[in-house]
Regions:
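Nucleic-acid-binding small beta-barrel platforms of the OB/S1 family
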Residues: 1-3, 89-273
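Compact, glycine/acidic-enriched structural inserts
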Residues: 50-56, 64-65, 78-79, 84-94
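Sequence-level detector for tyrosine residue identity
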Residues: 15, 22, 38-41, 54-57, ...
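Structural beta-strand/beta-sheet cores of well-ordered domains, especially the beta-sheet scaffolds
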Residues: 26, 58, 74, 236-238
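OB-fold single-stranded nucleic acid-binding module
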Residues: 64-79, 246-250
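N-terminal ordered "arm"
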Residues: 2-68
Length: 273
């Protein structure tokens, strides 16, 4: 097992998903200073102590090794107990963000990207849609399967006996299941239309925060569309961070989902070129 230590800029945090071993996990991905992608796991984010919880555009230093069980070339296991939080890029410093995010290839042809994922096992990419047509959602099951929750709770009780000091397990509650799936409808450079689900934590957090604030799911849904479509898609030079799931990487016709967004202000984009 060959460990390496890397400085990574966090770009992606997905909405938490259930895990039998870790209760729940957050898909976390970012780039090093040369613009190379890394997928970091396992990270039981909400169980980490406060001083180890990171936000987007935070540099972190991690000790990691390539997971031999995962064919996706960017996937690394980390020693999250040794993770160090470094400086954060200011929220309005889009030049500094772009210097990392746009350093390497920005994909515009979805079919070619899918072919590339099959031939080289790449599974993370920056993608620039040519036209964003809509932001949609559909209602799904509101609760996790009861049996799955029971299995996770039983496993957690055992694991808590050997919990790590860096994990904040007191009064930990499993994350609420999102009752909607959100997707962007867009065209690539060839005019090919696609509908891809977005699993960015920001979407889920916005749904719960606005539902609580307005006491209405319908208003919350419209507010989310205003942010991600009316603002990001219509007024910004929006890029997607695409990623594949391990389950469908080699199986799905299109294994990619949207795991994050990069809403670059157009004035910054113009100044870069």
């Amino acid at each position: 097992m060959d460990f390496i230590t890397k400085k990574i800029l966090i770009l992606v945090k997905t909405y938490p998903s259930l895990s039998k071993k870790y209760t729940e996990l957050v898909c976390t991905a970012g780039m090093d200073e040369d613009g190379n992608w890394y997928r970091l796991y396992p990270i039981p984010f909400r169980k980490l102590s406060d001083e180890k919880q990171y936000g987007k555009y935070r540099w972190i230093e991690v000790k990691m090794f390539k997971n031999p069980e995962d064919p996706r070339i960017e996937s690394y296991k980390i020693v999250y107990e040794d993770m160090k939080l470094l400086n954060k890029i200011p929220s309005n410093d889009w030049g500094a963000k772009s210097n990392i995010v746009l350093k390497k290839e920005v994909h515009t042809d979805l079919s070619k990207l899918i072919e590339l994922s099959k031939s080289t096992n790449i599974s993370l990419a920056v993608f620039k849609p040519t036209k964003i047509k809509n932001f949609i959602w559909k209602e799904v099951e509101r609760e996790y399967p009861k049996e799955r929750i029971e299995n996770i709770e039983a496993e957690r009780k055992q694991l808590n006996l050997f919990s790590n000091a860096d994990e904040n397990i007191n009064d930990f509650k499993i994350v609420n299941k999102l009752p909607y799936k959100f997707s962007f409808v867009f065209e690539d450079i060839n005019g090919k239309e696609a509908t891809l689900m977005i699993e960015d934590w920001e979407v889920g957090a916005a749904f719960w925060n606005w539902t609580k604030h307005y006491k209405s799911e319908d208003i919350a849904l419209q507010k989310i569309k205003e942010k991600f479509f009316d603002d990001y898609a219509q007024k910004k030079d929006l890029h997607f961070f695409l990623g594949t799931t391990r389950q469908f990487h080699n199986m799905g016709k299109n294994p990619f989902i949207i795991i994050g967004v990069f809403p670059l202000p157009k004035v910054v984009q113009n100044s870069l070129f």
